[in-house]
Regions:
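Internal alpha-solenoid helical repeat scaffolds
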Residues: 1-160
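Helix-coil-helix junctions within alpha-helical repeat/solenoid scaffolds
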Residues: 7-17, 31, 125, 133-137, ...
Length: 251
């Protein structure tokens, strides 16, 4: 899934289905395995929110504990710093998207042991930012960041700071923007996780493009070949946005 190996993924999914249906499992084992399979399908339904919610509801009827498919520490967005970039697909559907995120969050947190807690604040904050409600967006960025810090979710911390960076830029405070760059970089470096370093590189490159500072963008982004960096599939759309901005600025 993360590396877009679709044929191999289909094969594995069919093998799991066959095992569940044909193995001599107890009722409890069958329910638990089927519930975990629903959480796997939740991941595979990315980024169709309606299907994801349905798989969560199916899993909740079968599992009496948090899922083992999605652990507390795994990043829900797999490196993407924006909930909105990943889930907004239908024109005029933003308010409905925010509503569904808030309505489904308790079920998701229960099934995943509070994985990526605060993503609903992040989405709402992005919506408010694009509607030029910058003060409200900034408040929501702080809410998302504080929740992420509480639950030790590095990816969400970076995402919340990225939202705040954009809001601060729109407010016309470049000194604060570059201060937030340093904070994003420090969090990513301290994590020791290559995924978060890639996320930080892209967030900072996105902002540098606004300031025409392409010389400060990491070379792997400028080269335009994300395959060499083994970027997860959910992060590629954001990479494309950043690379597109760089290409425009080169003209």
């Amino acid at each position: 899934f993360l590396m877009d190996e679709k044929e191999l993924l289909d094969q594995v999914v069919h093998e799991i289905e066959d095992y569940i249906e044909n193995s001599n499992l107890s009722f409890k084992e069958h329910d638990e395995l089927t519930g975990e399979f629903e959480m796997l399908k939740f991941c595979l339904a990315y980024n169709d929110l309606n299907k994801m919610i349905q798989h969560c509801q199916n899993a909740a009827r079968l599992l009496k504990r948090p899922s083992m498919i999605i652990s507390t520490g795994e990043p829900m967005m797999f490196g993407s710093p924006s909930v909105m970039f990943m889930f907004y697909k239908e024109r005029g559907g933003l308010d409905d998207l925010v509503r569904k995120m808030y309505e489904s969050r308790d079920l998701y947190y229960k099934l995943t042991g509070n994985n990526s807690r605060g993503f609903e604040y992040l989405l709402e904050g992005e919506v408010e930012m694009y509607r030029e409600h910058n003060d409200k967006a900034e408040i929501l960025s702080y809410k998302a960041y504080n929740v992420a810090r509480k639950y030790n979710h590095t990816g969400m911390e970076i995402s919340a700071l990225f939202l705040r960076t954009r809001v601060v830029m729109y407010k016309g405070n470049p000194d604060k923007v570059f201060e937030l760059f340093k904070q994003i970089r420090m969090i990513a470096d301290n994590s020791g996780h290559e995924l978060y370093k890639q996320t930080a590189d892209l967030c900072i490159a996105f902002m540098y493009s606004y300031y025409n500072q392409l010389r400060l963008v990491e070379q792997w982004i400028i080269d335009g070949n994300p395959a060499d960096m083994h970027i997860y599939t959910p992060l590629k759309p954001f990479y494309a946005i950043v690379y597109g901005r760089i290409c425009i600025d080169r003209e």
